[in-house]
């Protein structure tokens, strides 16, 4: 079990608990999650066109007006999820704030770098990766069945959007999708055009691309990956801080992440 902070205010109705209306507005059941299949610029690109995107807390960085946001209030971070069939991948992109993934189901390959060749790691169910901010990253379901990963993005606005690798924008245009400089998608297959005053999202210059980090796996995996079996052992009697300034994966992304087991759940809520 994962716990995030800062936590939602549970006394907002002034009587020590949530009202029914407030609770419903801040609750999203797994069976109620509504996917969006046109969330990002690669929605028509072969190999990436079967993705499902879920925005659970906050709007995340979805580029589609069709995206359903389940819980609109954000406590300093956004939580979303991606569901993908086998061999479906999410194209190379970067964020200006933290992006943390927790594997809910399946087997996933995460890769990074300008062309996705700088390094990679394979994660199993329960594993966590805190991808370094400012590098191009992508991920692919390499399991045999439909897989799902949860994502946590730092900031109430999740950093304000996505920066795509140039080849992703070019491939998308060949399949009818254009991203405006307002971070919204326009589908030429549906007869959509860029509105007046909106230009295509510019691709990064060669100068900016040259400054993008290309860390090798040896620099990323030890400080940015936490394995489920290790977490279970470390959190056997008391919760372990996975992400935070003094955590297992040291970082200050604007939120903290703890891992709690049945054996440590009692001490998780004990007064400190």
Sequence positions of predicted segments:
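Histidine-centered metal-chelating micro-motifs
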Residues: 89-91, 109, 128-129, 133-138
């Amino acid at each position: 079990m994962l716990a995030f902070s800062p936590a939602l205010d549970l006394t907002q109705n002034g009587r020590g608990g949530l009202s029914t209306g407030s609770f419903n507005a801040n609750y999203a059941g797994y069976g109620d999650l509504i996917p969006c299949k046109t969330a990002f610029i690669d929605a028509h690109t072969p190999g990436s066109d079967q993705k499902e995107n879920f925005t659970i807390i906050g709007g995340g960085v979805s580029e589609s007006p069709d995206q359903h946001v389940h819980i609109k209030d954000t406590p300093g971070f956004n939580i979303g999820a991606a569901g993908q069939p086998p061999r479906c991948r999410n194209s190379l992109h970067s964020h200006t704030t933290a992006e943390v993934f927790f594997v809910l189901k399946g087997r996933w390959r995460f890769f990074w770098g300008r062309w996705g060749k700088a390094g990679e790691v394979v994660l199993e169910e329960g594993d966590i990766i805190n991808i370094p901010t400012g590098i191009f990253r992508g991920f692919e379901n390499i399991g045999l069945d439909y897989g799902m990963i949860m994502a946590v993005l730092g900031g109430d606005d999740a950093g304000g959007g996505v920066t795509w690798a140039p080849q992703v924008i070019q491939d998308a245009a060949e399949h009818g999708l254009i991203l405006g400089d307002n971070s919204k998608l326009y589908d030429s297959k549906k007869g959509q055009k860029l509105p007046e005053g909106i230009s295509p999202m510019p691709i990064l210059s060669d100068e900016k691309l040259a400054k993008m980090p290309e860390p090798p796996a040896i620099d990323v995996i030890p400080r940015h990956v936490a394995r489920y079996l290790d977490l279970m052992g470390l959190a056997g009697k008391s919760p372990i801080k996975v992400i935070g300034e003094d955590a297992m994966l040291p970082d200050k992304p604007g939120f903290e992440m703890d891992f709690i087991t049945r054996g440590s759940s009692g001490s998780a809520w004990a007064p400190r």
